[in-house]
Amino acid sequence: MQNHSRDGHLGETTDVDRAILDTARTVFETYGVRRANIEDVAARAGVSRSTIYRRFPTKDDLFERVVRREAELFFSTLDRATAGCTPQEAVVEAFALGVRLVQDSRLYSRIVESEPELFGMFSRSHVFPIGQFADGIAHTLRRCGADMPEHDLADVADILLRVALGIIVFPTDRLDISDQAAVRGYAARYLVPIIGR
């Protein structure tokens, strides 16, 4: 069964859960979030629909769990990438990693390309864990030495996340997101000042 700790991290996941989540991710990548259905996930995972519904009562619950698992992978990667960084360097790393994640992730790429409006809907619902992402960014900045008050740090993390999502979901011709040097330069010039020097 799914277990969430108080901080939103996933608890232990069984082999069946992993198989369902891996398959669900593939189905969401293939059909998009709106067109995907539990029947396809069950058939491809080799389990019954009732097995999925016992673990994930709705498609939104299943999608939320897939996204949360992606978030945990992102933040474990971010923790490694920002080890020994200053808060300013961490902003650059987080932005560059976030852009690369969306480019490399078939799931996020599918959403950005065919269902970008879902990011807006998800940010106002429990499905897309925008709070978890913002908290993770705040945690990373604090670990890297950010010394601003907690409330200010939470606001800064939220702003950084929303700016990054805006650029990723609605690309601009002012930034070539396929050019990592340009992405890092953009973050250093425009996002680092938000955290202060």
Give a label for each model feature:
Residues 20-28, 74, 78, 98:
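Short hydrophobic clusters on alpha-helical segments that form packing/core surfaces
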Residues 19, 61, 73, 89-97, ...:
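Amphipathic alpha-helical interaction segments
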Residues 45-56:
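Short hydrophobic/aromatic patch on the recognition helix
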Residues 72-75, 119-147, 151-158:
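Amphipathic alpha-helical packing segments from all-alpha helical-bundle domains
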Residues 80, 112-120:
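Short linear capping/connector segments at secondary-structure termini
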Residues 65, 79-106:
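Hydrophobic alpha-helical connector segments
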Residues 1-44, 61-64:
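Basic, helix-initiating cap at the start of DNA-binding domains
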Residues 143-189:
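Hydrophobic/aromatic-rich alpha-helical bundle segments in the mid-to-C-terminal region
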